[in-house]
Amino acid sequence: MRSRKIPLVVAAAASASMLLASCGGGGEDDGATTGTLDFYTNKAAWEPDFDELNAASESRADITLNTTGYSDAEQYDAFVRQSFRTDKSPGLFTWQTGPSLAELVEEDLIAETTDIWTKAVDSGWVSTDLRETYTYDGKQYCVPMNIAYWVMYYNKNIFAEQGIEEPTTWAELNSIAERLTGAGITPYYQTSTLFTFQWFQQMVAGTDPELYEGLSTGEVKYTDPRIVDIMETWLDQEEAGWFSDAGSTTDPAVGLKQGDYAMINFGSFFNGSLDGAGMVSGEDYDMFVIPATNPDLEQTPVAVESGPLCVAENSSQKTLGLTYSEWWMSPEAQTAWSEARGDVAFNPKATVADPMLEELGTTVASDDYQLYDRYYEATPTPILTVALEQFGAFIANPGDPMPFLETIQAEADDYWAEQE
Amino acid sequence: MTSDKATRPKAAKDPYHWSARGFIAPGVLGVAVLLYVPLLWTTFISFTEYNGLGDPEWIGVENYVEMFDDPAFLGSVLNTLLWVGGTLLVPVGIGLGIALLTWNLKGGTWLRLPFLIPYAVSGIGVAVIWSFILGSGGALDQALGAFGFSDTPRWLVDAPLNTVVMILATAWQGVGVNALLFTIGLQSIPKEPLEAARIDGAGGFRLFRSILWPMLRPLTAVVVGLSIVASLKTFDIVQGMTKGGPGRDSETLALTMYKETFVNSEYGLGSAIAVFLTIVTLAAAILYLRQQLSSKHEG
Amino acid sequence: MPSKSTAPPFKSTARVIRTAVLAVLGLLWLIPVYLLIINAAKAPETFTTTHSWRPTDFSLLSNIGEAMRLSGLADSVLSTLVYAVVSPVIAVLVGAAAGFAIVALRLRHGFAWFVAIFGGTVFPLQMILLPLFDAYSRMNLFDTRLGMILVYTAISIPFSAFVMRNFFTGIAHNVFEASVLDGASTGRIFFRVYLPMASSALVAIFILQATFIWNDFLLGLVLSQSDTVRPIVTSLAGMQSTYGGAQMSTVLAGGLLVSLPTVVLFLCTQKFFSRGLALGQY
């Protein structure tokens, strides 16, 4: 009998807690413009860099970041989503552009940054192209924390031994791959978990940027004959032995160092990992922008990834967070950040520490290149999850691409139907 | 009347009624407040559509329908069953073996130590070191290569081999705990029946079957019960080594739940999987424990 | 009264074989530990995965130093130590009390109550993280040591109750009856009779739960924020990610460092498992 009472007691406690939960979250903005700002990030490995930046922000803006790093990106997303309901909603946090940010903006959870952007664009601190990524319904939200271009890294020693130059056309890249395979060297790195999308992204956007755009808006189906053709090309390359063993668990930076493969298609933040693995920038490794698959394209498409720095609308530190965001955009902050982190800077007036990254920044800014959003941010999350799995399965066991594409398209159909 | 003062053990109906309640109360309260209340919230969410923002919207059993409709869910269930069977067979079996071998053996406690050390290695360490061993061209392949076996399978890519090797990696970590629990069981066995059996000339396997095994039952129930529960919610090692891939080949139920909740922000669907997993686990545990425990000691 | 000294149950040749089997198996078990150590000792700049079995150089200390610098590990040690000691101690006592109530005091519907407590372990921890975070931040328990101790205690109780309940069923009920005849109260019987008899089980539960808490990553990640409250493994995990950060050998070195205290704990508590129980004292 008593045991039957257990659920009752628990149910009572639960309804009490739900009552609590229904009282909305968030705190009053305390209006402070100086002091300690609580900052949450999913780039936990950068925590020491943010701490280093505090020296500059303390003296210039009188704001100190109190950084909490989350090493698990998925747990982090859930934590931030939940925090909007509590009085812990963050004064400053990192997020993803694309549909994930749109979702928060639609719920009115993000503080507007239009004024900050207007000032930054007027001062020539940031390009109008980048502003587009942060614009929703004509207003801006968040500021860019980091920016990365997806390029091809290569082992310079291998290229030198084989007498290979950086390719300028897709055909040259293919002949390099053939030549390396002939010499018993695997040309490209690949993995069957998480980073499974980049080659697909590269070939689709490099064939036709509009086709790529269509995939992310649902106008183009994954089973479109043009997409199937691209997958067939990928399959041919897999069968020709152009890609590394999908079962390898070696860290990609170490793999490139020890010559497991000659090239890796990765974001420009990869310099940090390669340096850490003991390779010297410009000596042991270098990078090139991957030529477009379709030689008739006027501009070479380059995938760009940009991580925003956002302020919660209902945070008690909203004013402080926005004050910091404004400072963040300045050349002074960006130069200090580039020194601490060693990454590409979005602000052309900032000084970049690594000459290779400096050069990359100038190259892609020219009219010969066209930036497009990385597949990871451009694709709605449910479709992305399935696509990453399916590309992973394809990479592990390459075969007829149709079943993989059909599975992705089934999820896409569901998703777009729900959006109606 | 206070039961504490009762001096007649078989008096009245239940002289320790209140005393017993007092002893169990802290345990029940702690678990109820910190674990069951959040679980009820999860159960509520499983009947709603919720993305972590705004308010949950009641949709009835739709999430459950969607869950059973998904062919990948079935694969997940099968993998989870493989984990349950595998962990009962390997870590429990070896754990019992080690406990018996070290029992009453001079230096036995020290010989047991190597099996306990892996338990001390943190989860991050375990996933990293086993990826390192099992990856293509990794430590295992290098060792096999040295003995002339070069054509090794892709341990972490080919299904269901990847699940099998991950079960073995889990066994590596879990055997010591099971051995320790069995050892405690062996220690609680009274000496008289053992002496008597030995005087009768019983040794080895007969001694084990007739005396040790029946007397180990309470602790066997612990080890098997924990093993079933732990294997049904296998998550860390799979997330650390294959992330359920390639595709969804090595996904377990806990991983499917995690993906829906944390990756896709489908809190309702994720919660539905969690509820399903909880019911299955509880049912398995009750069925097993009822049979093992209630016959002898309680009414 | 049975004699305390127990004659070895098997003959000496069998002992040798047993020792040999255990030694071989034990060495096999230590192979991954060996790989962990030698690879944690390799300098990140020269680290490769092509010669996993051979030690190449000894940079263990500098790797450990780097791991501590990157993760702010030093700040976490004290609070993690508090969690790993306080929570299991409470949980062991609470669990033993529950087992005592069910077995010795023959609590009515004991099995149902037992299942109610044990049920606390059956669902995946990931599912209760978000409601816990929500509740914690409303009750000002988020990012406090008290909050961490509470949650660690709660998740350790079911295991502790399970083991203690089953351990106590191995003790004849007349032990309890004899104590009652001596005029002891239930509290006294619990603390003076049952707990001492269960010392090896209590120690086993303590070290297993302390290790579990010491190695916890998930609860620390969601329920804490500041360096002084965050447990050690959560801090450690922070230094590794796709976006740069620590190299493999640094991660391994950090993992090794974190594991050391638990290995020492195992070493120190071994003597509790060396002998059988003296059950004949009543």
List the predicted regions and their residue ranges:
Chain A
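A structural signal for short loop-to-beta-strand junctions that line the ligand-binding cleft
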Residues: 82-83, 90-91, 122-157, 186-187, ...
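Conserved N-terminal structural module of periplasmic/extracytoplasmic solute-binding proteins
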Residues: 2-102, 166, 279, 290, ...
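Short, solvent-exposed loop/beta-turn-alpha elements that line the ligand-binding surface or hinge
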Residues: 114-126, 192, 208-229, 276-280, ...
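Hinge/lid segment of periplasmic solute-binding proteins
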Residues: 98-150, 174, 282, 286-288
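Extracytoplasmic/periplasmic substrate-recognition and gating elements
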Residues: 228, 232, 240, 277-340
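Extracytoplasmic/periplasmic solute-binding protein
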Residues: 137, 141-145, 150, 174-220, ...
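C-terminal capping/gating helix-and-loop segments adjacent to ligand/active sites or protein-protein/ligand interfaces
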Residues: 343-344, 361-413
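Glycine-centered hinge/linker elements that transmit conformational signals in sensory
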Residues: 179, 217-246
